[in-house]
Swiss-Prot record:
Quaternary structure annotation from Swiss-Prot or TrEMBL: Homodimer.
Sequence ranges of Low complexity compositional bias: 50-68, 77-86, 98-135
Top-level taxon of the source organism: Eukaryota
Protein name per the record: Dirigent protein 25
Any one annotated GO CC term: apoplast
Segments for region (Disordered): 50-135
UniProt entry tagged with the keyword Secreted: yes
One of the GO biological process terms: phenylpropanoid biosynthetic process
Keyword entries, A-Z: Apoplast, Secreted, Signal
Amino acid sequence: MAGCKVLFFLILALAITFVSAARLLDEEEDIGLVPLPTTSPGPLPTVGLGPFPTANSGPATGIASGTGSASGGLGSLGTNTGPGPLSTTGSSLLPVASSGTLPVTGPGPLPTSSGLLPGASSGNLPGSGSGPLPTVGSGAAATGLGAGAGSVIGGSVPDNTLVFFMHDILGGSNPTARAVTGVVANAALSGQIPFAKPNGANLPVSNGVPSDNNNNGILNNNNVPLLVGLGGTTSNILQNNGNNMLNGLPVANGGQLPSGSSLQMLMFGTLTVMDNELTEGHELGSGLLGKAQGFYVASALDGTSQTMAFTAMFESGGYEDSISFFGVHRTAASESHLGVMGGTGKYVNARGFAIVKTFTGSSGTQQQQPHQFTDGLETVLECTVYLSY
């Protein structure tokens, strides 16, 4: 009896297995009979029926913007399921190839979307042909991608140029510079030593020491300006005790100078200390900017250059703002260059250079110049300073 039950269950299990397998096979055959969607009932999109979507053609309502029709059929395509044609978007236009302009980088702008696409921009993209390219040094910010509010590289730089006029006055009633060493310390030329050179003078009967050695005091602080000023050696016009006058001006003759000497060689090594005024214009009476204190030395045998070292102190900062200069001023050249050696106040750690130009002229009433308002010899230096920090 037990054996019959086991045999019955085995037969039942086999029957169920066969039935299930047959059902699975029937389902697979049914799935395979479902027809694939084809495009035969409806015409496919054709080539050449509309222009390719370009920039600025209007707002896009589908995947992309375009002006041509999606297909050449008689009716609009619908959304079908099953054996019908492929499903398409009803109201939007499909991008199809056409005879229109291809979106390439060239004379036209890159195609951009004016719709609400992520990252869309109404400005010109960098690299578009007809739009403005973000260039260096144009001064205008880019209008497309990457535009910022900062300044463009290569724009204008801050102006650190400073211009002032220095008035150097030697001699006269109010000199601002004085020669302290060199030729003015030569007692033989200043008439301080008797018999500085043999001149045939006879001793006085009173056994006194003769004070006149026939040089008539060639050099003093009133005629040295004609030789050692910042304007350079101008002439051999000197001042004496009233002898050798020419047109009201004293003249030195060859017998008044030591043998083998020239005016330029006599001035070599002369050091002049200065405390000159700095003004806004070339006139001495123009706006006062400050003071220039320092010295210059006649450093050329031919008298054509002065080695200068001075500090320009400006009144606006209570004379706390200053710039120091050092260099060679060539009086025979149209302009010279001095180096900026530093500064104080707002000019601390200043670097750069100065271009120096000379305005010269005789003082007094005989050859009065527009920039001269003194009875001494005035030399005006125009200093254009270029600074960097």
